[in-house]
């Protein structure tokens, strides 16, 4: 749904990050909140992460897509009438020259059509969980390569915890600079105009 609604503090946002390099695709969701995260949103993210980690832990040669799908909740457990209604929310799919390839990992199809996991397979696993506030939700996705003895997660964008836009984060080299400390003057001016607009204040573009 498209709208002219300005993002507000506390809003959840998730992106499906799609790159292409030498013809090969990526597909991984990352979830953020604007300014701060509510308890409901944090709880939803933790639940979402737990289901994702449980699925990743099972990835190794000899396992099947049905075994992975079995660790995910039934549709009725998170507000949907059946598996078809929530298809692709708790989901896995191969990825390569196309974004969606085999194998497919889903409670809708994997139990009836299981596929053996083999070394060299590359696929994405994604999970979703609604928050108790009734309108927000969390979504996370990781890309995995199947090795001879297990798996390797190849996505590098942090997703262990819910990220909050505008908060300071730290690395081994020290704090990451906040966006507003880095932005150029034109970007800063645009941001100030958007913020003023959300407060219904009038700002002249020539100032």
Question: Where are these predicted regions, by residue range?
Answer:
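Active-site neighborhoods and metal-handling regions in enzymes and metal-associated proteins
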Residues: 1-207
């Amino acid at each position: 749904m498209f709208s002219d609604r300005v993002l507000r503090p506390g809003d959840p946002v998730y992106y499906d990050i799609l790159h292409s390099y030498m013809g090969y695709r990526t597909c991984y969701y990352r979830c953020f909140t604007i300014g701060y995260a509510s308890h409901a949103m944090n709880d939803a993210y933790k639940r979402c992460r737990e289901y994702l980690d449980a699925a990743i832990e099972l990835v190794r040669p000899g396992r099947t897509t049905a075994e992975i799908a079995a660790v995910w909740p039934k549709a009725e457990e998170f507000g949907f009438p059946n598996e078809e209604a929530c298809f692709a929310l708790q989901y896995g799919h191969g990825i390569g020259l196309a974004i969606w390839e085999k194998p497919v990992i889903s409670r809708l199809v994997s139990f009836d059509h299981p596929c053996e996991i083999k070394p060299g397979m590359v696929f994405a696993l994604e999970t979703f969980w609604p928050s108790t506030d009734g309108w927000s939700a969390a979504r996370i996705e990781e890309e995995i390569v199947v090795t001879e003895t297990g798996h390797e997660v190849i996505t590098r964008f942090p997703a262990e915890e819910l990220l909050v836009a505008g908060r300071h984060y730290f690395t081994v080299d020290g704090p990451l600079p906040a966006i507003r400390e880095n932005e150029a003057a034109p970007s800063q001016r645009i941001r100030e105009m958007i913020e003023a607009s959300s407060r219904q204040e009038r700002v002249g573009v020539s100032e």
